[in-house]
């Protein structure tokens, strides 16, 4: 996922059989935007432990994508509309991840002593 000041971010994929000895070329899968201005300025993201969800954050919110049950592969997740996940107050959101069991989302901001936020999934 590219980080851009304006316009859509691009989603790229590295082949699972990448070559450690040569240059690898990423495949562009999609353009990705969120409702924040300017397009979210995305700062972090994670794939859920079960491989069925993606969480992405910008400075203010998090956005979750859910893989449709009938999807043929994970790449189809990028066709879904992101749903806002409220994280509470963060100064400058920088990181977001799923808990090991996938039942919570953790987030934090940049700088020292930033709060560590936990949001339980419903």
For the regions a protein language model found, what residue spans apply to each?
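Sequence/structural signature of beta-propeller domains
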Residues: 1-122
């Amino acid at each position: 996922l590219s980080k851009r000041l304006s316009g859509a971010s691009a989603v790229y994929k590295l082949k699972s059989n990448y070559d450690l000895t040569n240059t690898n070329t990423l495949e562009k899968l999609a353009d990705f935007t969120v409702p924040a201005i300017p397009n979210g300025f995305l700062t972090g993201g994670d794939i859920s432990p079960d491989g069925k969800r993606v969480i992405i954050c910008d400075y203010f919110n998090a956005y979750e994508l859910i893989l449709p049950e009938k999807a043929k592969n994970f790449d189809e997740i990028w066709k879904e509309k992101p749903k806002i996940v409220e994280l509470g107050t963060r100064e400058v959101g920088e990181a977001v991840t799923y808990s090991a069991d996938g039942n919570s989302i953790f987030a934090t901001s940049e700088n020292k002593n930033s709060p560590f936020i936990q949001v339980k999934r419903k």
